């Protein structure tokens, strides 16, 4: 989100403020979810023309995003589904609905589904890898819970360092993408 803020707000990366990063996060996720300049203005408390300028600048700086959105929308309308990066089909039955509001919601879902679905596929692969490693190593640590892109593992004190070291490697290795996956680990009570 910091690099988006740097591009959209014409600010050096190391000078991006927390507020600019927060706004860039709203822009990044909002536009992918189909938010209009009007919605962006409301969400961020901005004048509509200012929000529209941010949207224009975003698509100017990141033209691939607009191409992706248009291509995905057209593909979904033609096939009735979209796919994750791993080929899992996500059906979008309302993509050709005659009612514009229903169709627009399906278009937003079609654009978002490959990203959310791919993220879901990756975390599931990570869960399988972590569980297999815990079993193979015969550790007492247990995979307890998955929350969005996080895995919660319960480990006895004597296994914490080993799990802390191995978990990010297993999670980052869950998929080979053109952009590396980076996983952080935290320890808490």
How should these model regions be labeled?
Residues 1-189:
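Conserved catalytic core of nucleotide polymerization and phosphodiester-bond processing enzymes
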